[in-house]
From Swiss-Prot:
Keywords: Cell junction, Coiled coil, Cytoplasm, Cytoskeleton, Phosphoprotein. The lineage of its organism: Eukaryota, Metazoa, Chordata, Craniata, Vertebrata. Essential for intermediate filament organization in intestinal cells, interacts with intermediate filament and regulates intestinal lumen morphology. It is found in: Cell junction; Cytoplasm, Cytoskeleton. Residues 25-74 form a coiled coil. InterPro entries: BBLN_eukaryota. One of its GO terms (cellular component) is subapical part of cell. This is Bublin coiled-coil protein.
């Protein structure tokens, strides 16, 4: 609805807009800081995850090699026992 001068009605909270701007800037700065901390933590977790993944790949390969060696030994043992 328009006012007597043809202007649109002023929102109820428009008078506190300036107060919200200064609070909003501080809030944005705090949120930005928290997001930076979260990003840093996520980077650290990603590095740990990559390291663990590499170690698990090494362990998996080692276990494969060990299993193959045991299978070869078991396969050769009966052949060695027979004359």
């Amino acid at each position: 609805m328009s006012g007597p001068n043809g202007d649109l009605g002023m929102p109820v909270d428009a008078g506190t807009e300036g107060e919200n701007d200064s609070f909003g800037e501080a809030e944005y700065a705090a949120i930005n800081s928290m997001l930076d901390q979260i990003n840093s933590c996520l980077d650290h977790l990603e590095e740990k995850n990559d390291h663990l993944h590499a170690r698990l790949q090494e362990l998996l390969e080692s276990n494969r090699q060990t299993r193959l060696e045991f299978q070869q030994q078991l396969g050769e043992a009966p052949g060695d026992a027979s004359p």
